[in-house]
């Protein structure tokens, strides 16, 4: 474990993230513009894809970071039996959920039960599939629906706020099952589906289209919200949530329904709307990419 990763164990995660939230919403022209210009230069942000390409037009750093895209700049895969990539970013890992465990990095894994905070809910994804997508600071930070789904419930699982960058993922055991996260359960035409919005160091908030700001407030116990009977349906490719700084979204899929798109591997760059998985034909067996051991 390198020095920087070791240092992250000692940092006051929530205090730093709360401070980041205040700074992100600051509208002082010199402060917000310095932050925006610094991130654009450091991470090579492509503002030509943004609905507002003028870096000086954003009232705050958060408005810049959660910017919308130009209409038509991302399009969904036209096949209705194709599950869509929920975000721009890079594949951290993907593959089968083997013996209830989700692969994180070489020598690292965690259980679906740990991730979801619910043994019964995790059982629906035994032998299913997962995909972990990392959104870097340069990426579009809104998360969209892979397919049309009816919101059933959310689970706010408290935890740490480690960085979710590539080095941290390789070195911090069970990282995604330790960080604060919002677990969103959906019922779809293909069966159950979960999207997990994972918080991280300096992530100043997670917002959903149905509930607004969900994180913070940071929690000390698991909190459930039941949405059954509320008729909250979100269409395929529609926005469902956003991060107020870079982080990670994890998709869980049920067994024997999909096969992951064969071109996807760990570290693949991905864009919102491209194929994540294809529905299996009745006589087709599930296939999954090879993972590192």
UniProtKB/Swiss-Prot annotation:
The modification Pyruvic acid (Ser) is found at residue 247. The keyword tRNA-binding does not apply. It is an enzyme of class 4 (lyase). The lineage of its organism: Bacteria, Pseudomonadati, Pseudomonadota, Gammaproteobacteria, Lysobacterales. It comes from Xylella fastidiosa (strain M12). It comes from the Bacteria. Catalyzes the formation of phosphatidylethanolamine (PtdEtn) from phosphatidylserine (PtdSer). Its cofactor is pyruvate. Its main location: membrane. It is found in: Cell membrane. Disulfide bonds: none annotated. Pathway: Phospholipid metabolism; phosphatidylethanolamine biosynthesis; phosphatidylethanolamine from CDP-diacylglycerol: step 2/2. It catalyses: a 1,2-diacyl-sn-glycero-3-phospho-L-serine + H(+) = a 1,2-diacyl-sn-glycero-3-phosphoethanolamine + CO2. Keywords: Cell membrane, Decarboxylase, Lipid biosynthesis, Lipid metabolism, Lyase, Membrane, Phospholipid biosynthesis, Phospholipid metabolism, Pyruvate, Zymogen. The active site is at residues 88, 144, 247. Binds 1 pyruvoyl group covalently per subunit. This is Phosphatidylserine decarboxylase proenzyme. Is synthesized initially as an inactive proenzyme. Formation of the active enzyme involves a self-maturation process in which the active site pyruvoyl group is generated from an internal serine residue via an autocatalytic post-translational modification. Two non-identical subunits are generated from the proenzyme in this reaction, and the pyruvate is formed at the N-terminus of the alpha chain, which is derived from the carboxyl end of the proenzyme. The record marks 246-247 as: Cleavage (non-hydrolytic).
